[in-house]
UniProtKB/Swiss-Prot annotation:
Cellular component annotations (GO), alphabetically ordered: plasma membrane
Sorted UniProt keywords: Cell inner membrane, Cell membrane, Magnesium, Membrane, Transferase, Transmembrane, Transmembrane helix, Ubiquinone biosynthesis
Native source species: Histophilus somni (strain 2336) (Haemophilus somnus)
Keyword flag Membrane: yes
Gene: ubiA
PROSITE patterns documented for this protein: UBIA
Location in or out of the cell: Cell inner membrane
Name of protein: 4-hydroxybenzoate octaprenyltransferase
Lineage: Bacteria, Pseudomonadati, Pseudomonadota, Gammaproteobacteria, Pasteurellales
Amino acid sequence: MTIFAKDKLIAYGQLMRLDKPIGTLLLLWPTLWALYLAEKAMPTLSVLAIFIFGVFLMRSAGCVINDYADRHIDGKVKRTSLRPLSTGRATPREAKWLFIVLVFCSFLLVLCLNLYTIGLSVIAVILAFIYPFMKRYTHLPQFFLGAAFGWSIPMAYGATIEALPLECWLLFIANLSWTVAYDTQYAMVDRDDDLRIGVKSTAILFAQYDNKIIALLQIITLIFLFSVGYLSQLNNRYFIVLAIAGLFFVYQCRLTKNRDRESCFNAFLNNNYFGLTVFIAVLFGI
């Protein structure tokens, strides 16, 4: 079977999660928040296109390296047992080359930006590479994911104003808290399997306090987003829409109350609407 056979291409697409765009959206929203907040207006179409394509490529690369790192684990977990590397539809060598190609394409995009952003992109690649391996060594892999998913924020500021003001880092912390919250919801789905095979996560670390800590992280997210709006001198419409966005967190807390797998997964998916609503708040506020 050649590497370009139909079955192989389908397997590569599944490695990149082309059939599951939620991760791309969760990475895209904070990137858009940052681009519009840094400019206080719509960014140039070229910068916007570079970041949108970059988000797609780097999220895809992250999924590929994640499956490579978990290739001996995924087959033991119900939700991931049919992934391409677990079933042999793609080989580890093919996954490594796919990761390299995706990162290389991302780097070509970054070369269209300023040197400031090119320098920041190196950290993005490092974070994307090390995150999947953290679940073997620490119960805090979600924090590494938060840093990886949030690094597009300083890159967005660097690409537009070549500076990293306080509001950039407040936005980064807001996104970090949000990411840890929703990825803990995601980890709650696999908690029983992870305990059995020895994989670490915040869902395991937080134990019976998981819902309370998720709620605390969501409150921190909102506080920092309100702070960003204040420092950026956004108008009142931003704060009104942001308050509406907070209602999604209330709904998610209700979903995860009984820790049912399907409900926890639905709570995770619901974060797409939170990210979208915050973006709408930014558009109304600038």
